[in-house]
């Protein structure tokens, strides 16, 4: 089971967090501070797996971001590396070569994509095409809702004149 997902920049700024196990806000802050310090200070040639507090942390650096997932000791690290890579590929497909700014300004989309991929700390959807289709449908729903809200606003504005 994946306990949490962290995306941290090389500067140590947290760009995305998703928690699948209960942690208090104080514990979350401590975990983020501790893990970002450990991961950012590791050399690029070192292993992408860390044993930490009875768990394993699997991380991978893509451009200026570190994608980290904390898993149970018995879980397969290589499978989690593939899940990270799968998430990055879906982000790349959606944003067209994803970068840190895409995640900053469109964080809600990054969370939505992650929610389509993982549920309760387990891989839900392995098909990139299915995830892309679902995200596209959600984008269309948002556009329709914006158009309806705009037309309702126009009707109200004309009625109050």
UniProtKB/Swiss-Prot annotation:
Q: How does it sit in the membrane?
A: Peripheral membrane protein
Asked whether the keyword Protein transport is assigned, the reply is yes
Expressed in which tissues: Expressed in seedlings, roots, stems, leaves, flowers and siliques (developing fruits and seeds).
Where is it located?
Golgi apparatus; Cytoplasmic vesicle, Clathrin-coated vesicle membrane
Q: Which Pfam families match?
A: Clat_adaptor_s
Q: Name one GO cellular component term.
A: AP-1 adaptor complex
Protein's recorded name: AP-1 complex subunit sigma-1
Q: What is the protein's species of origin? A: Arabidopsis thaliana
């Amino acid at each position: 089971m994946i306990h949490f997902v962290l995306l941290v920049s090389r500067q140590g700024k947290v760009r995305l967090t998703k928690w699948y196990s209960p942690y208090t806000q104080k514990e979350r802050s401590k975990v983020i501070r501790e893990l970002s310090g450990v991961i950012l200070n590791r050399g690029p040639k070192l292993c992408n797996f860390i044993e930490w507090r009875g768990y394993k942390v699997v991380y991978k650096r893509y451009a200026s971001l570190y994608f980290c997932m904390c898993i149970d000791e018995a879980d397969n690290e290589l499978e989690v590396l593939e899940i990270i890579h799968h998430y990055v590929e879906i982000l790349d497909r959606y944003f067209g070569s994803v970068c840190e700014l895409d995640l900053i300004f469109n964080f809600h989309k990054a969370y939505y994509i992650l929610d389509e991929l993982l549920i309760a700390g387990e891989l839900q959807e392995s098909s990139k095409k299915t995830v892309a289709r679902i995200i596209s449908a959600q984008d269309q729903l948002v556009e329709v809702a914006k158009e309806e809200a705009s037309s309702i606003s126009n009707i109200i504005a004309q009625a109050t004149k």
